[in-house]
């Protein structure tokens, strides 16, 4: 059964045609009976009201479909840079991906981002060059672009027949046939025909290149070529599949999803070339009991092991937990063990999702993706398994939020509801956070960009019907230190007639930018009943110190912004069994941290953004001056046929309103993407 399953993602730059391609896949595999278009807000995978309004994909919708006895789980991911977290968590659980590229734009900035994310998770992929019917479409230029940008071997298994207005089909280099689609049946009917004489020389040239690439890793094909024999189609497919799994080269297909050309061969390629769940590298897990790493093969007979990769709120069912199963089997009604949180939870129901519709399942097993209902404490990145064999899968890393707005309820009665909704939204989206400002008492929400914040506040106001006022966007700064400092703190207070005492020494030191925070301890732990000896604490007191320091990281040093790139080392403690309490150690640690950091030359860090501007050549000078006026530094430029791409870095604080200014400076012809790059000391 596993070899008949594919878990794939559709990934690309915004507007390359991912959702349209997915719609066509669902239509031709019989999952939907009418093609929905993004432009008229009818796309099946874009089911949120805002997605239909904006014509972009925000959340990664999951759906299951079937093709030639194969089950294909498809995740359609957003291309907009503000929703990178959605792409990240999808790629984490996929076995293969289809990279959709625009035949005109080629490799665009967000293509690079998702490509590198896929590289990080070692996801095998195939490429589909879409929009071959557009003016300026150039399949061969896209091949060159991918090869140069990513340094990968590219190998077309098809070439287009014509381009732009004259695009009419593709030549299949494996079967050496032309494929033409019937427009009257919305491309459902298509036929293979002999290659026209005027196109034969080009087809033979590219087939020879394809066989050269394949034969470099296949003695069998080399032998057949040397003997002048025909190379069977099945052997070619087998060798391509092997190479895709090893990521030796990337097969390229082409078409126009909107014009219903080229989609069925793409689905064939998913089945023929992308891996089954048991063909990718086994999942790496950690056994916290034995403190050892191990590989978990994907098989239904093993102990149950799954990863929660997404949480979605449903007003009737509560939390929908999207789970990828790596081993074993979980049935409806089973108890599962959340390894990280060390808690048991019951799976009330299991669902197979189709965008925002669902069907009930009795069980889910290794390799599959499903939705669990009934889990109360599980969050994105949590591992579910069995208590007898606790294993932890590697969690997911998400970027830090860089932009904030204040929200306040319109009435006191809305206050609790607002907090409840913010908790739901931050559980759904790990790059969205909310906190209370310690000085003003205001609620501050933070996200990845203006669009991200706009989408979330609209969900809060429209979907959850919360009555609240939303402030103007502000930059989310960070605090850090620049020198090392050691500090000792004694705490002594009588509370309720009982002495509370603690004494500890902390060293704080700066870390490299981008390292995050960490807490380390030289202090040993012992059981309460044992004797501590020197420089040792009971486990609950050491936990209290750690908890206190983590709280300090969130609340900042001078201004109240979260800290970053600080290491705190617990150097030594004094322990008196009669007066030591968790409260005393928490208070001592917090005061010690504040004093040490205040003396360690604290600094304010601001987020710096990577900005990519796509501009027609005649406006590129105006576009560049817009970014330099904002204190931006131009790092490099790429030139394409009629477009230049400017790569720059600029402080987030100066980028508000950039979209409007860029549009007016370039008569609305330039566009840009912006993503977080790094924090640096505020200029």
Swiss-Prot record:
Subcellular location(s) of the protein: Cytoplasm
Main location, first listed in the record: cytoplasm
GO molecular function (one): translation elongation factor activity
SUPFAM superfamilies: EF-G C-terminal domain-like (SSF54980), P-loop containing nucleoside triphosphate hydrolases (SSF52540), Ribosomal protein S5 domain 2-like (SSF54211), Translation proteins (SSF50447)
Binding site for GTP: 12-19, 76-80, 130-133
Single biological process term from Gene Ontology: ribosome disassembly
UniProt xrefs under PROSITE patterns: G_TR_1, G_TR_2
GO cellular component: cytoplasm
Gene3D superfamilies tied to this protein: 3.30.230.10, 3.30.70.240, Elongation Factor G (Translational Gtpase), domain 3, P-loop containing nucleotide triphosphate hydrolases, Translation factors
Record keywords: Cytoplasm, Elongation factor, GTP-binding, Nucleotide-binding, Protein biosynthesis
Function, as annotated: Catalyzes the GTP-dependent ribosomal translocation step during translation elongation. During this step, the ribosome changes from the pre-translocational (PRE) to the post-translocational (POST) state as the newly formed A-site-bound peptidyl-tRNA and P-site-bound deacylated tRNA move to the P and E sites, respectively. Catalyzes the coordinated movement of the two tRNA molecules, the mRNA and conformational changes in the ribosome.
NCBIfam families reported in the protein's UniProt record: EF-G, PRK12740.1-5, small_GTP
Family: Belongs to the TRAFAC class translation factor GTPase superfamily. Classic translation factor GTPase family. EF-G/EF-2 subfamily.
Name of this protein: Elongation factor G 1
Organism this protein belongs to: Treponema denticola (strain ATCC 35405 / DSM 14222 / CIP 103919 / JCM 8153 / KCTC 15104)
Gene name of the record: fusA1
């Amino acid at each position: 059964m596993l070899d008949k399953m594919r878990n794939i993602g559709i990934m690309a730059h915004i507007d390359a045609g991912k959702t349209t391609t997915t719609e066509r896949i669902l239509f031709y595999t019989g999952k939907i009976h009418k093609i929905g278009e993004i432009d008229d807000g009818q796309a099946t995978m874009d089911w949120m009201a805002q997605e239909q309004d904006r014509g972009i994909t925000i959340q990664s919708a999951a759906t299951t479909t079937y093709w030639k006895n194969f089950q294909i789980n498809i995740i359609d991911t957003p291309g907009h840079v503000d929703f990178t977290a959605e792409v990240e968590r999808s790629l984490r659980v996929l076995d293969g991906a289809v990279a959709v590229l625009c035949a005109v734009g080629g490799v665009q900035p967000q293509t690079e981002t998702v490509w590198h994310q896929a590289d990080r998770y070692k996801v095998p992929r195939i490429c589909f060059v879409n929009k071959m019917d557009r003016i300026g479409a150039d399949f061969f230029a896209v091949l060159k672009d991918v090869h140069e940008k990513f340094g990968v071997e590219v190998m077309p298994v098809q070439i287009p027949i014509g381009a732009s207005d004259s695009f009419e089909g593709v030549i299949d280099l494996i079967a050496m046939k032309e494929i033409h689609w019937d427009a009257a049946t919305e491309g459902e009917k298509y036929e293979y025909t002999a290659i026209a004489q005027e196109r034969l020389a080009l087809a033979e040239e590219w087939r020879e290149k394809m066989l050269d690439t394949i034969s470099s890793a296949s003695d069998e094909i080399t032998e057949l070529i040397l003997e002048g024999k025909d190379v069977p189609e099945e052997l070619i497919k087998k060798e391509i599949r092997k190479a895709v799994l090893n990521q030796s080269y990337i097969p390229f297909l082409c078409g126009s999803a909107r014009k219903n050309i080229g989609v069925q061969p793409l689905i064939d390629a998913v089945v023929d070339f992308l891996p089954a769940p048991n063909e990718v590298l086994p999942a790496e897990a950690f056994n916290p009991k034995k403190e050892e790493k191990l590989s978990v093969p994907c098989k239904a007979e093993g102990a149950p092991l799954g990863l929660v990769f997404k949480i979605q709120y449903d007003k009737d069912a509560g939390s929908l937990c999207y789970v990828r199963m790596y081993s074993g089997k979980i049935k409806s009604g089973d108890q599962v063990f959340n390894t990280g949180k060390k808690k048991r939870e019951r799976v009330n129901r299991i669902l197979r999702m189709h965008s925002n519709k669902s069907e009930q399942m009795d069980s889910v097993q290794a390799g599959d993706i499903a939705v669990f209902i009934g889990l109360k404490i599980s969050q994105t990145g949590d591992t579910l398994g069995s208590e007898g064999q606790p294993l932890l899968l590697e969690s997911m890393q998400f970027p830090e939020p860089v932009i904030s707005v204040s929200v306040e309820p319109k009435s006191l009665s809305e206050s609790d509801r607002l907090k409840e909704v913010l908790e739901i939204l931050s559980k759904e989206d790990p790059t969205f956070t909310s906190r209370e400002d310690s000085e003003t008492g205001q609620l501050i929400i933070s996200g990845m960009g203006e669009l991200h914040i706009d989408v979330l506040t609209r969900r809060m106001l429209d979907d959850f019907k919360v009555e609240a006022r939303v402030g103007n966007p502000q930059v989310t700064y960070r605090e850090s230190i620049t020198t090392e400092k050691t500090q000792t703190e004694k705490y002594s207070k009588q509370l309720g007639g009982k002495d509370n005492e603690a004494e500890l020494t902390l060293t704080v030191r700066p870390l490299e930018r981008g390292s995050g925070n960490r807490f380390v301890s030289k202090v040993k732990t012992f059981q309460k009943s044992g004797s501590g000896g020197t420089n040792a604490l009971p486990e609950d007191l050491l936990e209290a110190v750690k908890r206190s320091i983590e709280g300090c990281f969130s609340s900042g040093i001078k201004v109240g912004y979260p800290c970053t790139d600080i290491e705190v080392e617990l150097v030594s403690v004094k322990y008196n069994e009669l007066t030591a309490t968790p409260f005393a150690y928490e208070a001592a640690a917090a005061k010690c941290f504040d004093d040490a950091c205040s003396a360690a030359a604290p600094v304010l860090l601001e987020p710096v953004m990577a900005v990519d501007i796509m501009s027609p050549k005649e406006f590129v000078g105006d576009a560049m001056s817009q970014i330099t006026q904002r204190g931006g530094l131009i790092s490099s430029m790429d030139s394409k046929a009629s477009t230049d791409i400017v790569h720059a870095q600029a402080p987030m604080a100066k980028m508000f309103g950039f979209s409007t200014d860029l549009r007016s400076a370039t008569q609305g012809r330039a566009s840009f993407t912006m993503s977080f790059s790094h924090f640096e000391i505020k200029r």
